[in-house]
């Protein structure tokens, strides 16, 4: 289940740079537990899928999982050993821009211990530092 947009307005985009903390997608809105990024990174569709598979295997059909990031930015690359010039390379894969504080996954319907184990396992599949977070219950 590779994540990629069905259609895009522009086939190629500029790389840009990731500045600052996340101002959106930084609250636990759906589940009870979350995996939060601590570093800026361009997260690929394959990395999201690897973490999702690891999470689902750990929770074993229990609970509900939300994927809060989507790779909507094309990452283009020129082939190896090609001289400079000749235009921008072809889009290779899709990336999601992840800022520090961005929630990547949310989980509900499982106990805290299992959720923490599953999120830690999913975080180990990702190439940047993450932490486990839980929803604060308002009494």
From Swiss-Prot:
Q: Which GO terms describe its cellular component?
A: cytosolic large ribosomal subunit
Q: Name one GO molecular function term.
A: rRNA binding
Query: What assembly does the database describe for this protein?
Result: Part of the 50S ribosomal subunit.
Q: What does this protein do?
A: Binds 23S rRNA and is also seen to make contacts with the A and possibly P site tRNAs.
Q: For this chain's UniProt record, which GO biological process terms are given?
A: translation
Keyword check for tRNA-binding = yes
Asked if the keyword Electron transport belongs to this entry, the reply reads no
Please report which protein family the annotation says this sequence is part of.
Answer: Belongs to the universal ribosomal protein uL16 family.
What is the superkingdom listed in this entry's lineage? Bacteria
Q: Identify this protein by name.
A: Large ribosomal subunit protein uL16
Keyword list, A-Z: Ribonucleoprotein, Ribosomal protein, RNA-binding, rRNA-binding, tRNA-binding
Enumerate the PANTHER family for this protein: 50S/60S RIBOSOMAL PROTEIN L16 (PTHR12220), LARGE RIBOSOMAL SUBUNIT PROTEIN UL16M (PTHR12220:SF13)
- Source organism of the structure: Treponema denticola (strain ATCC 35405 / DSM 14222 / CIP 103919 / JCM 8153 / KCTC 15104)
